Amino acid sequence: MKKFTISLFLLLLIVVGGVYLLGYGYLLKAVRVVYATGHSTTFLDDYTYFDNRTISRSTTPQAWAFTADYNKVAETPELQNAHQKYGTVAFLIIKGDSIWHERYFDNYNSQSKSNSFSMAKSYVSALLGRTITDGYIKGLDQPVSDFFPQYKEGLAAKLTVGDLSSMASGLDWDEAYYDPFSITTRAYFDGHFREKMLQLKITSEPGKAFKYLSGNTFLLGMVIEKATGKTLSEYLAEALWQPMGCEGDALWQLDSEESGLEKAYCCIASNARDFARLGKLYREHGKWNGKQLLDSAFVAKSVQPRFPDHPEYGYGWWLLDYKGIHFFMMRGHLGQYVIVNPTDKVIIVRLGHSLSDEAPEGSTFPSDIYTYIDEAYKMINGNS
């Protein structure tokens, strides 16, 4: 038995050593964080397994008001079923500037943090807009090569910061969440990703076509960091988080404390009420309580499609024309949503453990998004 144990230990050492030698050391962290905790993919509370940087809350927090009929309207049976089926942890409806309805599940509450996943892309795009206003970046057409000389040659020389925000970079990136060997998986678990990011090639002409790639926002975050001389967390806190009166500290996952690079394409841990604020800021054309935090023209451009053949995306925001309404939304893995109707001034926030794996015919969006919209409006219109 002792010889068997020693042999098994040596075999494990060889396997682990081989994994590192082949450049797949990040897989060991993936196994420890995901599979060893009983999950099959990244999850809402996984930020506790990573190094994070704090996005400091406002020193003058602005609590949301509540409508006179707050939580007076019952949820529809269809909405309740969706919550149960997809593991909702937070559901929030804001009318105007006030919370009209909210519910929490699974021991979450209004202060509980959970992972934004790709909703963070909307924050990074907003920071791009702010860097232009602040003079750090000249405009959407400024070349990425102005910040990183690795992009001065060939197709890469045509790459602009606007191409990164609108998902039109031509970057060689595999957007596969469940493939352990994909670059997306490596980016999530690799502790030193900065150099790897700058080694990736541009393989098709930038600015010509939409292709959703998390690497675009990762590189855009690095551009913003380089342009401002500040970490993304620091710049987000001073430019938007604090001016919007966010009540809680947020956390932004890092590749590692040693490297200190925010995962710009994902992974801000906060709560439903504070996530809703960016939706309100864009709903109000970049203005917050009378102060212009983002240029209104930039906001307007962000929530309209850049490419007519891909009307579902603008600059960092998902777009949905549904039942005569133009919605724009923040959207993240496993069904994290901030859905905005600028006409009715309604914001719907949903956070949770999973989403539908089906989509209506002809739609690029999962069916649960339509459920949350439809059932919220049944409640608002008194049809619950």
Where are these regions (language model features)?
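Active-site SXXK
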Residues: D97, N115-L140, L164, L220-I224, ...
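Active-site Gly/Thr loop motif
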Residues: G248, Q253, V299-I347
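Active-site helix/loop module of the DD-peptidase/beta-lactamase fold
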Residues: D134-D172, Q199-K201, T228-Y265, S270
